Amino acid sequence: MSVAFASARPRGKGEVTQQTIQKMLDENHHLIQCILDYQSKGKTAECTQYQQILHRNLVYLATIADSNQNMQSLLPAPPTQSMTLGPGGLSQSGSAQGLHSQGSLSDAIGAGLPPSSLMQAQIGNGPNHVSLQQTAQSTLPTTSMSMSGSGHGSGPGYSHSGPASQSVPLQSQGAISNYVSRANINMQSNPVSMMHQQAASSHYSAAQGGSQHYQGQSMAMMGQSGQGGGVMGQRPMAPYRPSQQGSSQQYLGQEEYYGGEQYGHGQAASEPMSQQYYPDGHGDYAYQPASYTDQSYDRSFEDSTQHYYEGGNSQYSQQQTGYQQGTAQQQTYSQQQYPNQQSYPGQQQGYGPAQGAPSQYSSYQQGQGQQYGSYRASQTGPSTQQQRPYGYEQGQYGNYQQ
């Protein structure tokens, strides 16, 4: 019998079916009965032999469970009598008479392992669900994502970065603080590309998508945006954002990320990043909420940003430049795009104060940072947006927020 069982086990390896598993369970059940009989008769040698066979069978089932997550469906299926009991009940029902040890083993092995696999799959799915849930959690961010999707649709540059950021916004927007912290970490890990795209686009999506929700989402998103995009800079930017975090961060954070995100993403990110990279320049910038008035902010930001773009991250500045150029176009386009979105223009109109400020600021920036201003000039909409953030910072943000 033991030989037959032992031989049955290897035969089952090639074909893992419910019949094979059921046969294995029946075999184990019979083995346990034999073991119990021999134990009652005091025949320890036979008990040991059957226990070894049982152990091999259980290990085999465990191996199958590990190798095939579908086994989880297979295991419950064979014991229709114990379907309600599940794999554990299955094993125990299969080996019910004192096979509980086996049942437990089988459960642990058969049921437990597939659940582990499931859990892993669920864990794998979990994050997806998480991001979805996060997305679901923040319907506005979700909407903003949709907005960002459309916005990205409007802004081709953001179309691709938008989708990526949409993924990010899903998460970052969904679990804005948490994920954004993660995203920020990630973004910080990839401050340039990731943040540039994700943060930018997430902020952009936040900005666009959120632009309608703009304050509500931009608050959340700007927490993101500020965090996501600014995260890199947000640490240093935190001072800046905190000043603006109350409101202007939300608006400004996004604004920066919205305009700055696109542009300011280079900027805003650069601003934060520049703050990080240019804590000195952005120390001012960080503290420039006060000195943040257009000139100080613009200077430090431009300087830092210029440094950051040009000097600080030549690659980022180049990337940003390329991105900004693309973005500038996109941002310019986005400016158009935002106007196209009207939500943002409304937002911009909402920003209007900020936008007026941006005009000031952009005039200032353009005047101030010809380089950056010029760049902003192309991205004046975004930079204006950033300028708007600055604007708000100047109280035009208050207007925006109002």
UniProtKB/Swiss-Prot annotation:
In this chain, the stretch annotated as Necessary for interaction with CREBBP and for the recruitment of CREBBP to the nuclear bodies covers 393-402
Cite a single Pfam family from the UniProt record.
SSXT
Subunit-structure text = Homodimer. Dimerization may be necessary for its function in neuronal dendritic development. Interacts (via C-terminus) with CREBBP (via N-terminus), EP300 and SMARCA4/BRG1. Interacts with the nBAF complex. Association with CREBBP facilitates transcription while the association with SMARCA4/BRG1 suppresses CREST-mediated transcription in resting neurons.
Query: Does the entry feature the keyword Coiled coil, yes or no?
Result: no
Outline the segment boundaries, as ranges, of region: Necessary for nuclear localization. 340-402
Gene (UniProt) = SS18L1
Region annotated Disordered sits at: 72-129, 141-170, 195-250, 262-290, 305-402
Instruction: Report the residue ranges where the short sequence motif SH3-binding is annotated in this entry.
Output: 377-385
Q: Annotated region Methionine-rich intra-molecular domain: where?
A: 149-237
Gene Ontology CC terms, in alphabetical order: cytosol; kinetochore; nBAF complex; nucleoplasm; nucleus
A single GO molecular function term of this UniProt record: transcription coactivator activity
Q: Please state what the protein is called.
A: Calcium-responsive transactivator
Q: Where is the composition biased (Polar residues)?
A: 117-129
Biological role stated in the UniProt entry? Transcriptional activator which is required for calcium-dependent dendritic growth and branching in cortical neurons. Recruits CREB-binding protein (CREBBP) to nuclear bodies. Component of the CREST-BRG1 complex, a multiprotein complex that regulates promoter activation by orchestrating a calcium-dependent release of a repressor complex and a recruitment of an activator complex. In resting neurons, transcription of the c-FOS promoter is inhibited by BRG1-dependent recruitment of a phospho-RB1-HDAC1 repressor complex.
What organism is recorded for this protein? Answer: Bos taurus (Bovine)
